[in-house]
Amino acid sequence: MANRKHVSTLLRNIYNLGRDVNAKFNQVWIYAGAMVIVTVPVLAWLTIVLSIDEPFCQNLLVYYGLNLIHVSEGQNCNFMRFLLIFIQFPVISMNTATAVLYVLLCCFSRNILKEYLSNGEKVSPLDCRSFKRYLIFYEQIFEVLSSLEASLSFPILLTVSNNCAFIFYCFMALDPFGKSPWPLAEHFYNFTTLTFLISLLSFLCVTLAASSVGDETKNAKQIQEKLLQRVLASTRKPDRDELMVLFVTHKRPAFTLTAWGFFTFTKGLILPAIGSISTFSLLILQIDSK
């Protein structure tokens, strides 16, 4: 409940900051995100229920029901279709909703930073007072990003970890090089392929969206330094010391989003992560094939 309040406050703060800098929030992104949250679990469910037959459903029912659930003959698939809704939907829906929410918040924050940079190039007249307002507004952005980190860094860690685990499992199950001694059952081929693509896209979208926020904060620091040089050049010498104190007082480092502090989201994370998963999967397949 507390985390829900934090997210609500975060959404309100992002909206207010966007309004202050005239940042545009495309509502199409919100509608598209809502469609993704609904569509992904439904597709995952359909890829299984449309490809299973009665004997396979009976085996699944024994597995999930611990041999304690018995239904009349010919009704195993109908019961499993109903049961899979409660098995699949909570996990897939939660992971998808977390990833979509995180990506949207990162994109909105990036848009705010872009408008902040654009406004910095148009500051006029450029004096100590306007420069101070510019620095104070960045502090507000910094606080919102800190709130984003505090509220969603742990959920996004679980989501990204889940994505990596699914990529690893699906890569081994699909066995693109024919190394596995236990080929994937044909009933799960469509589901495994879909899960692999969804997990990969989720990992890429989360990483790229989060890293774009860090890139914009680095650009913001460069703009602030350029503005400082311009203000110093047009300021009388007695006021320069006060200006430097102002800059140091309101100075904030570039902000990098993390997954609960375990790793930072940068574009350089993508290739090592995917390469490590692929290498380890091939190693396991090679060992199993011997």
Indicate where each model-derived feature is located.
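Membrane-proximal N-terminal segments immediately preceding the first transmembrane helix
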Residues: V7-N22, V62-Q75, R133-E143, L243-T258
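Short, Φ-rich (hydrophobic/aromatic) sequence segments
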Residues: I112-Y116, M244-F247
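Inner-leaflet juxtamembrane helices
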Residues: M1-Y15, Y102-L113, S199-L227
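Hydrophobic alpha-helical membrane-embedded or membrane-associated segments
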Residues: A99, V103, L158-S161
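Terminal membrane-anchoring module of integral membrane proteins
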Residues: V36-I37, C128-K290
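Helix-loop-helix junctions within predominantly alpha-helical proteins
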Residues: L17-T98, K114-R133, C170-L200, I287-K290
